[in-house]
Design a protein with these regions (language model features):
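A short, conserved structural fragment
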Residues: 93-111, 348-349
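Short acidic, hydrophobic short linear motifs in intrinsically disordered regions
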Residues: 68-80
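Short helix-coil-helix linker/hinge
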Residues: 53-59
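Ferredoxin-like iron-sulfur electron-transfer modules
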Residues: 123, 285-292, 296, 313-342, ...
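Short, amphipathic alpha-helical interaction segments positioned at domain boundaries
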Residues: 110-164
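Long, low-complexity, charged/polar intrinsically disordered regions in eukaryotic proteins
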Residues: 2-47
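Short amphipathic alpha-helical interaction segments
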Residues: 81-97
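Catalytic cores of enzyme domains
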Residues: 160-325, 359-365
Length: 411
């Protein structure tokens, strides 16, 4: 199973004299249950991740807040009993820039788009994932030549390891309990729009164009925290970490105002989505904020995406399940192999139609956690390689996967 990377060591892990306020803040953000960090120590990722960049002064403010509860500035003044409002505002700005805090402007949207102008800014203490653990990895500096860099990760590479740990340790042993749709915890895969546009019954929320039109007044593109984190840990791919992940609505404003993203329009967002499809990336959204609300669209590479890892590594597809299930009609299938090659989850493989002396070859169905006990023996640590297996051990007719010319000849 994935272990803590040795590529980004933090001096705060296993500190003999841990900072009490940071321990307390780690417990607060983790939640009441605290599993698996109920007895928080300096060895735990919530501690050393926060200790890397969060000051005690910031912790004092955050500890006054409830997780995922919005507060206006006047409410923050009352909450913290601040005598110097200018100093508090500066501190809130710093916490927002780091990603310890998020903020919105009242969320004035319905099915058709914006319903009212932005109202007063509301500060929110997010959970770790999705939330501060990934926002810590997002910092965008634009150089004179137009190139981009991430000064925060360059100075604090351990933040990449922090994000990785917070997408693994808290979920281990839990993912099999997640129902279809992710229950607000996982990411929801949105299929390529061209693949569902002919279906009159498809819901608006299953179309990326719907979400982009809904939030058309506020769209931004920012750095992919998964790609950035993996690159720091030297497990990345050749993808550019910038200009893939799209923020919408108030979150788009937050990205731009805190230096984590760049404003774009609807047309540019659609170009990014098309480019992602051309590269074989997976579109994902999250419904953590409630029904008919999203804050972003991720264009995910299965080799580096932590959300897809959660479903693939733990072998629990509900974590990222789409509302659509692809099915193959054996009679109509000509074994062209396209679905096998394109599916990032390795959901289909090539088999053979030719019968054996005992009749047609029977292929096993994928085991699901809904019907079996689910332990580490069911995990697939080699999911990246497993998903690239194109055919069953029995072989395939046609033998496209082995043919030097890559030609499918139906057998």
């Amino acid at each position: 199973m994935p272990e803590l990377s040795k590529e980004a060591i933090t001096p705060h892990k296993d500190e003999k004299n841990p900072r009490k306020k940071i321990l307390k803040l780690g417990k607060l953000i983790t939640g009441d249950g605290g599993f698996p960090f109920s007895k928080m120590t300096s060895a735990d990722a919530p501690y050393w991740g926060l200790a890397e960049i969060v000051s005690d002064e910031m912790a004092d403010v955050a500890l006054k807040m409830k997780v995922r509860t919005p507060y206006t500035f006047s409410e923050m003044v009352q909450l913290t009993k601040a005598d110097d409002e200018e100093k508090l505002q500066k501190l809130l700005d710093e916490m927002s820039q780091l990603g310890l805090l998020e903020y919105d402007y009242g969320y004035h949207y319905d099915h058709n788009g914006r319903t009212a102008p932005k109202s007063e800014r509301r500060y929110i203490l997010p959970m770790f994932v999705p939330g501060s653990a990934e926002l810590f990895n997002m910092d965008q500096k634009i150089h004179e030549d137009g190139s981009l860099s991430n000064p925060r990760l360059e100075e604090h590479p351990a933040l990449g390891a922090f994000f990785e740990r917070m997408t693994y340790v808290p979920l281990k042993g839990k993912t099999q309990l997640i129902p279809p749709g992710g229950a607000g915890l996982g990411m929801h895969v949105i299929p390529v729009e061209k693949a569902i546009e002919a279906h009159n019954t498809s819901m608006d929320i299953e179309h990326l164009s719907y979400w982009l039109k809904k939030y058309e007044d506020s769209i931004a593109v920012g750095q992919c925290s998964c790609r950035s984190s993996m690159a720091v840990l030297k497990e990345g791919v050749a993808d550019d970490a910038y200009n893939w992940c799209i923020g919408v609505g108030d979150f788009a404003n937050y990205l731009v105002e805190t230096g984590k993203g760049t404003p774009i329009d609807y047309e540019e967002a659609m170009r990014i989505l098309q480019k992602a499809e051309d590269n074989g990336f997976v579109h994902q959204i999250t419904n953590i904020d409630g029904e008919n609300k999203i804050f972003g669209i991720c264009n995910c590479n299965v080799n580096v995406c932590y959300a897809l890892r959660s479903s693939q590594l733990f072998n629990t597809p509900n974590m990222s399940r789409s509302a659509y299930t692809a099915k193959v009609d054996p009679i109509k299938c000509v074994a062209c192999g396209k679905c096998v090659e394109y599916c990032p989850a390795g959901a289909v493989k090539l088999g053979q139609k030719l019968c054996t002396k005992d009749g047609p070859v029977q292929y096993p169905k994928h085991e699901l956690p809904t019907i079996l006990g689910w332990g580490e023996d069911k995990y697939d640590e080699n999911y990246r390689d497993s998903n690239r297996i194109n055919c069953y051990d029995t072989g395939t007719a046609p033998c496209k996967t082995a043919c030097p010319a890559h030609i499918a000849v139906q057998g």
